[in-house]
């Protein structure tokens, strides 16, 4: 099996971006507007995945605010601390669906039913299959976890609305591409799709002056 490409530091990101621009010269203009790309790596494990779950379908500002309240209430972002909150977590800004998802995740980690570190060393498809068997964790959440907690270089979360908007805008498409079309477009950028995603999130932020990437810098 070929070694998986990983983004572990800013040098990896810079090297990958250079290769990406060679693959698709259309991206040069987007890169100029986007400016420097943040690495955005975050710690793997329950804390990293829990933050991504909190970030589902809300603005970055809202996700950050909810997460701060959760961390204050938990004291430490660990499965046992989350489970100890019980339904009090609902008063901190979580929907019932997200609370159920986080509770299920915490229970699975505590029981040893899933190893959130080991799956990062598996092929992307295997990691996604392991994560999506848990209640409330879908493709977007799995892909974002593999990208930003595992450094996988060839993942593109086409379900991300801001990312699709940025692709449509940056490539001057007549309409915003849907998930299927965005996935097809992103095939051009293999094996650097996670770098392309970072590029388009940075482009979105530069154009709209609003952060949309699912994890902080």
Question: Model-predicted segments: where are they?
Answer:
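Alpha-helical ds-nucleic-acid-binding substructure associated with the helix-hairpin-helix region
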Residues: 7, 26, 30, 58-135, ...
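Short alpha-helical scaffolding segments that buttress acidic/His motifs in well-ordered protein cores
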Residues: 49-54, 102-106, 145-146, 196-200
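A general alpha-helix detector
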Residues: 48-53, 85-88, 126-130, 162, ...
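Structural motif
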Residues: 39-47, 92-97, 186-194
């Amino acid at each position: 099996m070929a070694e998986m490409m990983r983004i572990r530091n800013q040098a990896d990101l810079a090297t990958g971006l250079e290769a990406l621009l060679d693959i698709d010269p259309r991206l040069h203009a987007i890169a100029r507007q986007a400016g420097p790309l943040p690495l955005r790596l975050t710690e793997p494990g329950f804390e990293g995945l829990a933050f991504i779950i909190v970030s589902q379908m809300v603005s970055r500002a809202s996700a950050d605010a909810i997460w701060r309240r959760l961390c204050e209430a938990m004291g430490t972002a660990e499965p046992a601390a989350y489970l100890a909150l019980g339904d009090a977590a609902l008063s901190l800004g979580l929907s019932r669906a997200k609370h159920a998802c986080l509770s299920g995740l915490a229970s699975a980690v505590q029981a040893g039913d899933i190893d959130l570190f080991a799956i990062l060393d598996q092929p992307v498809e295997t990691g996604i299959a392991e994560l999506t068997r848990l209640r409330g964790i879908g493709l977007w959440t799995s892909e974002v976890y593999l990208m930003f907690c595992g450094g996988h270089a060839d993942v593109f979360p086409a379900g991300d609305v801001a990312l699709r908007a940025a692709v449509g805008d940056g490539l001057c498409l007549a309409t915003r591409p849907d998930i299927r079309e965005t996935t097809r477009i992103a095939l051009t950028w293999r094996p650097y799709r996670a770098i392309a995603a970072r590029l388009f999130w940075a482009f979105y932020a530069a154009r709209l002056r609003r952060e949309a990437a699912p994890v902080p810098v």
